[in-house]
Amino acid sequence: LLNAGHEVVIVDDYSNSCPESIKRVEEITGKKVVSYEADVKDKEAMQKIFAENHIDCVIHFAGLKAVGESTRLPAKYYRNNIDTTLTLIECMKEAGVTKIVFSSTVYGDQKPPYNETMHKGDCTNPYGWTKSMMEQILTDCAQADPELTVILLRYFNPIGAHESGKIGEDPQGIPNNLMPYVSQVAAGVREQLTIFGGDYPTPDGTCRRDYIHVVD
C-alpha cells in the first residue's frame, strides 16, 4: 500500500506482534507509518483514531486465529473476533467510512476446487465459525446500508517474508503456522517439527496444503 502511494494507519494491540515490524516497514519503504497501540474492541480508542485521521477504507485483519486454541477457549474467540468487527463497523458508520476489506477463510471441509460462489460449508472449529459469523455481520450491514461496500477475501495459507528479509512471520510464543515453526526449528529455537496425521488420501498419508506467498 505504501509503495502504491497510499497513506497507512495501523492499529495493533501487539498481542502477537511487535512495534519493530512497523519500524522495518518504514525502513523498506522510506515512508512514515501512523500507528496506534490499541485494542480494536475498545470503542472509545477507535473513535479517537477515526477522528484523528482521514480514513478512506478499512482493511480488517484484527482477530485471534489459532485453530487449536479456539477449540479450548471458544468463548474467548467469539468475544474477541466478533466484538472487534462490531466495534469497527460502528465506528466506521459514525465516521462516514464506507469501504471495508475483510480477511476471511470459511470453506471448511468442502471438496476442492473452491470457488467464490460455492456454499461456505460447515466450519470445523470455533475460529472458523467466528469468521463465518463476521462475514454474515458485514454482509447484513452492507445490505442494510447501500453506501457500505464490503469485500470478503477468503485466503488459503499465506506464507513467506519480504525479499529484504527484514519482515516476515515472527509470532510471539508457539507458532500456529508451518513456516515460522520450521524457521524456529532450523534456528535451534525448537528441537523438532512434528507432522500430525498419517491417514490422508496422499501417497505417504500426510496432509497436503496449498500456499500463497505474501508478496504475490
Enumerate the language-model features and the residues they cover.
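N-terminal Rossmann-like NAD(P)+-binding domain of SDR-like oxidoreductases, especially those catalyzing
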Residues: L1-A161
